[in-house]
Design a protein with these regions (language model features):
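P-loop NTP-binding module
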Residues: 1-168
Length: 168
């Protein structure tokens, strides 16, 4: 499988940009040395500022260090992680949360929504179908349950969030 140009940390691990991501990873780990960081949200003010690029490369860098990482594309209107990783766009986060809402939360199967990537230790949950209510889904009881369940099976969850200016 072809390594995507956006995944500089995977494509060119000795580049200066990859070193910046490793430094960022180390700084995040150092800041949280007293307690284990499990969830990291990457966002921006406006679209096009590079949050998806930062999220994907930071996820790769944590995975390269041996951490089991799940990258969640929570930008349900304009999610790009599936294109960055060459994955299927759905089912994804919105589909998962909708299923959880309609069924008993203990009866759903998260594995249907998690996709492997070509990066060892890195899994992806793409944004999925565009829902009518993305903001409500992100703060829902189902989202909290999903995050709590995922924390049990990985070392770190990186969330590629929505630009703050667009959230209502």
């Amino acid at each position: 499988m072809k390594i995507r140009k956006e995944l500089i940390a995977q494509r060119d691990p000795k580049s200066p940009i990859s070193e910046v991501f490793r430094t960022l990873r180390t700084n995040i780990q150092f800041m949280n040395s007293s307690k284990k960081l499990k969830t990291l949200l990457i966002t921006s003010t406006f679209p096009g500022e590079g949050k998806s690029w930062v999220s994907s490369n930071l996820a790769v860098t944590f995975a390269q260090a041996g951490n089991r990482v799940i990258l969640i594309d929570a930008d349900m209107r304009k999610g790009r992680q599936y294109t960055i990783f060459g994955a299927a766009p759905k089912p994804g986060l919105s589909n998962c949360l909708a299923e959880m809402e309609m069924t008993n939360q203990n009866d759903w199967d998260i594995s249907r929504y998690i996709q492997k990537t070509e990066v060892e230790n890195l899994l992806l949950i793409p944004a999925g179908s565009i829902p009518p209510n993305p903001s409500e889904l992100l703060v829902s009881e189902q989202m909290m349950k999903l995050l709590n369940d995922l924390k049990e099976v990985c070392d770190l969850i990186i969330i590629d969030g929505t630009p703050c200016e667009l959230v209502t």
